[in-house]
């Protein structure tokens, strides 16, 4: 029924029963959680996984019997969030899903009796933990909006949107026992029980050495963003493109553009060997670019303030640039800035996922005494 593994090979900490929730909107949460879950299982903990939407599909391919739940989703059009359509769709589907959610929790109480909850921005497991008096640990990048201070220059022009999204983040997972916030930038922490840790990296990325190449890697998950193809074609630069044409089963070449079906291994190889990267505001891609020292032109999804904030910190650090949209001039300025970005990125260092895993091990150990 649920993903359950027995306790084997545990190190210094006692085996625990952990309820782990993953929000389904955006693949970054699922990719990060896969890495953390692998580590938890390797430490001998028993883990029940509850996830929604695409996260459930992704995790079910790696872990047995992931339990699917209803979660929030976002509707996009022309690289923008459509707020009204998103709201009504979530209300309609959420009400219909509520009885099944409650049945799942009753089953969980009877069959598993978790000792601690870990939430990657997932509300249902958080609520379960709070209503059952369990320690709740938050692991995600979204909490940087709520639990850190951001200066006025960084937020210029998005102040109102920032306040709204910060309020949403604050209301979604309040009063956790600990917040482990993944980030490649380090603004002042204002929230209690908050620790900034480096981004979670896929082991495949850590194991792939960065090499100097000449191609641009382009990763765009919104299929409504076809206008980008014309700009890239006009640049004359070799571009390896993922995401724009999801129906592909093999490479499709048009002049200097190579459209590729998504394959994780080949994507990582193209990322590690790229001269530079163009992507949306994905925190996962942004973090991997920084780790591999690849300059990034980030084009956040309209209405996603968290992506805008991350992209502005990226630009402030000199690791890349950000733009609302891409035209020939924006692309030319970015290409000209690549050497300078490479110089700034050369000083960035991260020891894999050690800092996060050490922090999580301490939190799990201390949760026993709470």
What are the residue ranges of the model-derived segments?
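C-terminal amphipathic helix plus adjacent low-complexity
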Residues: 333-370
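Conserved nucleotide-sugar phosphate-binding/catalytic loop shared by glycosyltransferases and other
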Residues: 42-43, 48-96
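Active-site-proximal region of nucleotide-activated glycan assembly enzymes
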Residues: 135-196
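Conserved nucleotide-sugar donor-binding subdomain of glycosyltransferases
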Residues: 83-116, 123-124
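Nucleotide-sugar donor-binding patch of glycosyltransferase catalytic domains
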Residues: 155, 252, 261-262, 295-341
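A donor-sugar binding/catalytic signature common to diverse glycosyltransferases
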Residues: 116-120, 269-309
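Donor-nucleotide binding loops and adjacent catalytic segments primarily
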Residues: 37, 200-276
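A short, glycine/small-residue-rich beta-strand->loop->alpha-helix junction that serves as a flexible
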Residues: 21-34
């Amino acid at each position: 029924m649920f993903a359950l593994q027995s306790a084997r090979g545990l190190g210094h900490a006692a085996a625990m029963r952990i309820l782990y929730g993953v929000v389904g909107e955006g693949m970054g949460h699922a990719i990060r959680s896969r890495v953390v879950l692998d580590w938890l299982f390797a430490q001998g903990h028993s883990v029940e996984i509850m996830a929604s939407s695409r996260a459930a599909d992704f995790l079910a391919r790696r872990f047995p019997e992931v339990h699917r739940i209803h979660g929030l989703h976002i509707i996009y059009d022309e690289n923008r969030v459509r707020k009204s359509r998103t709201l009504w769709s979530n209300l309609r589907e959420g009400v219909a899903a509520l009885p099944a959610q409650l049945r799942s929790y009753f089953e969980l109480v009877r069959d598993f009796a978790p000792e601690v909850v870990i939430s990657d921005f997932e509300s249902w497991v958080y609520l379960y933990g709070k209503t059952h008096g369990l320690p709740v640990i938050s692991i995600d990048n979204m909490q940087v909006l709520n639990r850190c201070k951001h200066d006025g220059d960084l937020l210029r022009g998005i102040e109102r949107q920032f306040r709204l999204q910060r309020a949403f983040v604050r209301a979604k997972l309040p009063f956790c026992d600990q917040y482990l916030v993944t980030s490649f930038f380090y603004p002042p922490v204002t929230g209690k029980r908050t620790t900034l840790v480096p981004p979670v990296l896929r082991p495949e990325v850590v194991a792939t050495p960065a090499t100097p190449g000449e191609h641009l890697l382009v990763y765009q998950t919104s299929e409504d963003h076809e206008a980008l193809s014309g700009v890239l074609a006009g640049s004359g630069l070799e571009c390896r493109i993922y995401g724009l044409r999801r129906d592909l089963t093999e490479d499709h070449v048009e002049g200097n553009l190579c459209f590729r079906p998504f394959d994780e291994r080949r994507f990582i190889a193209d990322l590690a060997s790229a001269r530079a990267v163009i992507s949306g505001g994905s925190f996962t891609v942004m973090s991997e670019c920084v780790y591999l020292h690849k300059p990034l032109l980030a084009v956040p999804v309209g209405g996603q303030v968290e992506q805008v904030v991350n992209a502005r910190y990226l630009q402030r650090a000199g690791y890349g640039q950000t733009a609302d949209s891409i035209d020939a001039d924006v692309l030319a300025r970015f290409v000209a800035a690549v050497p300078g970005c490479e110089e700034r990125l050369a000083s960035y260092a991260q020891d894999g996922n050690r800092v996060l895993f050490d922090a999580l091990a301490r939190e799990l150990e201390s949760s026993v005494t709470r």
